């Protein structure tokens, strides 16, 4: 008779216990709540940061200046950025804006920043962007300047989103080139900025901006804004949204967070650092604990004792 090795046995045990627990909770086969780093469905997202969205909307509409959202990893910067990007690129008011997303900046140069910006803007029919660019950085910058004039003529404001500034900040030369390009872009425009910089990064990146490019830092009308942390209410809602997704049901206000009890949710909040990523991870550990408890025939409910004993 074949004897499974220790890890294969563990895989088999976990698979069986999770399947039994998921079936008991009414989950769709193959859907495990809280396991995905990226949200598998936008409906899972908890509505937070309304005040910051209002502020960003104000600065964009009035072309008041540039914005930086600075927070620790896992705080929800990616979701916040995607929320704004989706609205400005596909939403009902998308014809009022152009938006360019600059990613993977760890080895970027000033010229590459310009060309990526132009590549992003080439999709807009109102703008005449050349198919090829000059080799010299200053000449590419002149092309960007010409496009900025077209933006103003078309009464369009371009939002330039730059994510994970900390990746470039590790190398001083790279970061200096990125910041020089961003300041150059941010200064374009006759009656106001043609490009609104929308920067995302960690506190370490923000410190490096202050150190290396104070003139750019001073142009941030909303500097180093942070995102809201999750308390009990937000965590309870997150749990309910994930459970609704796992059951392929529509989330509505008041959707129950069972089998998570209130003491369990408080324990999750206490164990997390309040960021969406940390809260989700603690919710997953609690779910895993619930599956282990159920396998021991100790009940379906996830309590604070469940977490203490099995997580």
Model-identified regions with their sequence ranges:
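C-terminal alpha-helical "lid" subdomain
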Residues: 2-16, 80, 244-311
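Central P-loop NTPase core of STAND/AAA+ ATPases
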Residues: 122-151
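Conserved NTP-binding/hydrolysis module of P-loop NTPases
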Residues: 107-131
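A short, basic N-terminal segment
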Residues: 1-65, 308-309
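Walker B catalytic acidic pair
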Residues: 163-165
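Walker A/P-loop nucleotide-binding motif
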Residues: 63-83
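The catalytic "switch" region of P-loop NTPases
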Residues: 156-158, 167-172, 176-264
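Conserved catalytic segments around the Walker B and adjacent sensor/switch elements
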Residues: 90-107
């Amino acid at each position: 008779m074949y004897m499974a090795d220790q890890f294969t046995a563990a895989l088999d045990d976990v698979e069986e216990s999770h399947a039994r627990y998921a079936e008991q909770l009414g989950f769709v086969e193959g859907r495990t709540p809280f396991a995905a780093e990226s949200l598998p469905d936008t409906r899972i997202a908890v509505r937070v940061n309304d005040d910051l969205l209002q502020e960003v909307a104000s600065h964009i509409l009035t072309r008041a200046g540039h914005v930086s959202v600075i927070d620790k990893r896992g705080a929800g910067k990616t979701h916040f950025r995607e929320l704004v990007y989706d609205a400005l690129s596909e939403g009902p008011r998308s014809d009022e804006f152009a938006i360019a997303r600059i990613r993977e900046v760890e080895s970027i140069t000033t010229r590459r920043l310009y060309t990526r910006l132009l590549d992003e803007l080439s999709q807009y029919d109102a703008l005449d962007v050349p198919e090829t660019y000059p080799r010299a950085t200053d000449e590419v910058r002149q092309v960007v300047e010409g496009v900025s004039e077209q933006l103003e003529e078309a009464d369009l404001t371009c939002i330039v989103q730059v994510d994970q500034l900390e990746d470039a900040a590790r190398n001083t030369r790279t970061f200096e080139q990125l910041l020089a390009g961003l300041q150059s872009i941010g200064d374009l425009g006759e009656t106001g900025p043609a490009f609104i910089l929308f920067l995302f990064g960690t506190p370490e990146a923000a410190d490096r901006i202050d150190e290396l490019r104070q003139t750019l830092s001073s142009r941030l009308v909303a500097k180093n804004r942070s995102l809201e942390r999750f308390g009990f209410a937000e965590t309870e809602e997150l749990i309910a949204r994930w459970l609704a997704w796992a059951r392929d049901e529509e989330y509505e206000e008041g959707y129950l967070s069972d089998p998570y009890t209130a003491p369990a949710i408080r324990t999750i909040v206490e164990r997390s650092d309040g960021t969406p990523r940390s809260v989700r991870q603690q919710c997953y550990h609690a779910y895993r604990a619930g599956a282990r408890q159920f396998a021991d025939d100790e009940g379906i409910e996830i309590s604070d004792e469940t977490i203490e004993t099995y997580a």
